[in-house]
Amino acid sequence: MTKKLPSELKQTRKSIQTACEFCHTKHIQCDVGRPCQNCLKRNIGKFCRDKKRKSRKRIEKHGTQPYLNLGKRLVIHDVPSKTVSPSSVHLQRDFLSSDQEKPGKTPAHNTNIQYTYNINDNFQSAGSIPRITNFNTDNGQTVLENTSNNISASQAVHLMNDPIIPTVRKSTLNLKSHFLEQHKAMQQPLATNCLVATSNVPVHSGMDTSNKSDDDVDDETNIHFDSMWCNDEYMKLKDIVDISTPFLPNNSQIFSLQESEYPNPSASTRGNSSLHLTNLLNSTKSVNDQKDSSIGHSTSTFNTYDEVVSRPFISLDMLHLNRGANANTHPSHNAKLESECDSSSHSDADLEKHDTDFISPSKFRELVKTPQDLYDNKCLIKPHNYKLAYTKLLTTLRKKFLEGAEIDKSVSVKDEHSTQKHNLRYDLEVIIRSILERYAPIFISLTSNMIEEDLLLQEVTLQRALLDLENMAKLVSCTPMCIWRRSGEICFVSNEFYSLTGFNKNLLLDRTSFIFEYLDHKSVSNYFQIFNELLAFGYNDINKRKKLLMLNACSSTSSKITEGFSFTTDGKAIFTKCNLLLSNGLYLKCACCWTVKRDSFNIPILVMGQFLPIFEMD
């Protein structure tokens, strides 16, 4: 327990109003004497003086008012009396002095004030602040007008009717008049003043709405928001769009173009929808060019937009491929596919010209055998040309599905051979549709922000993962295994796979070969639908996706997805069946497992396929 101090000691330890500098710094008890006892004990009595406290902020001298730092001043607005009405009156924010804040006669209700902001910090040249204040009553008479034309800067300025965010009523907001007045204010010689006029009219039951301006009649055609800032932003965006948008034909012109291209309404529905859309866009573009040339505007600004490549490292050269197909206005469906099949025969020579930097998987494995070799020879690794790979894949699929698939018109439709070839054509359309609808949108969203260094890192990751998978294949030596890229290019084939199929190793790895060359048509169609829907980027609801696949399976016998496939819980592997091509030209039914390997962007880079033959007993 603390010992009680005597009364004499309590008096000496009594707190004083101001301590000396030493006692204040050391936080010890000081006395009223100067020098104090603490300073005398330490032989610093000559330095003992009162601690000076910081003075509080007072009103600045020279008569400067702190209210002038708000950066707001009054600006004269000549408002004609005939335009001032209870329905179209503008509120003006005014800075009233304390002695003039209350007029001689206060209006009973419907007091409307027009306010104006001025964001200008230069007040040196402001000798006086003119002001015009209008107080309007129900009958529209002006109670107080031109109250003062000269207010000294030394008077106290108060803000009247100053909400933080003015409330804008949807029924009384007039965007057109608001921005017209703002445009006129910008044309005035007050170039140094930034004026933003805002209408804020309260709604009362006694308001007379008979005197409406012409702008109020069109008020219903404008888009209103409850926020003043939303209206400003909307109008600014609208002005930008109106200024920068080139001439576009209206709906009647588009419909007339459509009727001219397709006189028969049923012909447009039976034709290819993508071809119809391309022809329509080309026709619309030609009409725009004619309009622009007649008006006299140059279209060079808009033509340069087509030449800009926003994603230079990931692109699809679809316009150049479809340019020749769009030349004919009415090609039949079969004739178009036949022309594409014929053009694919001479496209291989063009692809080889762009394939000078290609290193076959077998040659690359001779250089890189360990992970250390991969990083030592990192200069040899370049981003894989997937654009060229998909072009070769399209050529391979055309040869597989369309080679010798011309349908003879003289043969009856009931012929089994012609029906089978028609199904093959339809299967190819299903494959392309699944790529465009299921795979491409997600892939583009994931790769939209990738740069060239990311693609290089992706290739290094692929090669590193490929080394691990090859080592695993050596350990699990009993399962035929094949590894390919997401584009289908084969990267590795195990010895058991060679023994099962009978193909030569040099045939598969010394050139660009696709896994789809060694599957039948039904297995290829199943692979693309399962890979694009479930395996490429994972899946959430397994049962829902499985039902979706079953429902979306087309009606042809060759394109139906087999019902005997299952999933893993992590979404990286699918078990199904396929028919594997043998060296003698026959197909072997196999149970297969497709496992996907993704990178850090969740983009599939490798697919590992394991095959086990199924021998059926007669």
From Swiss-Prot:
Keyword Protein biosynthesis: no
GO process annotations (BP): cellular response to starvation
GO molecular function, one term: DNA-binding transcription factor activity, RNA polymerase II-specific
DNA-binding feature ranges: 20-48
InterPro entries: ERT1_acuK_gluconeogen_tf, PAS_13, Zn2-C6_fun-type_DNA-bd_sf, Zn2Cys6_DnaBD
Gene Ontology annotations for the cellular component aspect, listed alphabetically: nucleus
Region spans: Disordered: 325-352
Domain PAS: 466-538
CDD domains for this protein: GAL4 (cd00067)
Main location: nucleus
Localization terms from the record: Nucleus
Keyword terms of this UniProt record: DNA-binding, Metal-binding, Nucleus, Transcription, Transcription regulation, Zinc
Composition bias, Basic and acidic residues: 335-352
Family membership: Belongs to the ERT1/acuK family.
Functional description taken from the UniProt entry: Transcription factor which regulates nonfermentable carbon utilization. Binds specifically to 5'-CGGN(8)CGG-3' and 5'-CGGN(9)CGG-3' sequences in the promoter region.
Name of the protein in question: Glucose starvation modulator protein 1
Natural source organism: Saccharomyces cerevisiae (strain YJM789) (Baker's yeast)
